[in-house]
Amino acid sequence: MTELKLIHIFTDGSCLGNPGPGGYGIVMNYKGHTKEMSDGFALTTNNRMELLAPIIALESLKEPCQVVLTSDSQYMRQGIMTWIHGWKKKGWMTSNRTPVKNVDLWKRLDKASQMHTIDWQWVKGHAGHAENERCDVLARTAAESKPTQPDLGYQP
């Protein structure tokens, strides 16, 4: 059996106004090589950008990988590690029987994570973690760039 490539992914989301213009930032490290990605959206939320960042990163991987994915979003980490199991059993409803917010992105993140072995890590934001700080700059810059791209799944 072939050993999976070990990829370190760092993600962050940003939103000015929440809702407002938003963006995501990604830093990916593999064997000393670094790739950065970011994009902005005209009207979205911080939580949607926190979810979209790992989705884009995982979807960019061309083969199954061992991933260490680090984010400062407890919402994303708790959701994918804990809450999603109950949501799926309940037909994407919360324990209060209300529809899961951002269900389009949760379904996409669930699908994107299936082919990989992922260690979901949390890091405190704005605490000097180099890759997280870089992701924050990428996400904020994308949000501040006056993006015109719509976030098609955003529902006010």
From Swiss-Prot:
SUPFAM superfamilies: Ribonuclease H-like. The keyword Cytoplasm applies. Binds 1 Mg(2+) ion per subunit. May bind a second metal ion at a regulatory site, or after substrate binding. Residues 3-144 form the RNase H type-1 domain. One of its GO terms (biological process) is DNA replication, removal of RNA primer. Its cofactor is Mg(2+). Its EC number is 3.1.26.4. The keyword Hydrolase applies. InterPro entries: RNase_H, RNaseH-like_sf, RNaseH_domain, RNaseH_sf, RNaseHI. Mg(2+) 1 binds at residues 12, 50, 72. GO terms for cellular component: cytoplasm. GO terms for molecular function: magnesium ion binding; nucleic acid binding; RNA-DNA hybrid ribonuclease activity. Transmembrane segments: none annotated. Keywords: Cytoplasm, Endonuclease, Hydrolase, Magnesium, Metal-binding, Nuclease. It catalyses: Endonucleolytic cleavage to 5'-phosphomonoester. Mg(2+) 2 binds at residues 12, 136. It is found in: Cytoplasm. NCBIfam families: PRK00203.1. Endonuclease that specifically degrades the RNA of RNA-DNA hybrids. Belongs to the RNase H family. PANTHER family: RIBONUCLEASE H1. Monomer. This is Ribonuclease H. It comes from Shewanella baltica (strain OS155 / ATCC BAA-1091).
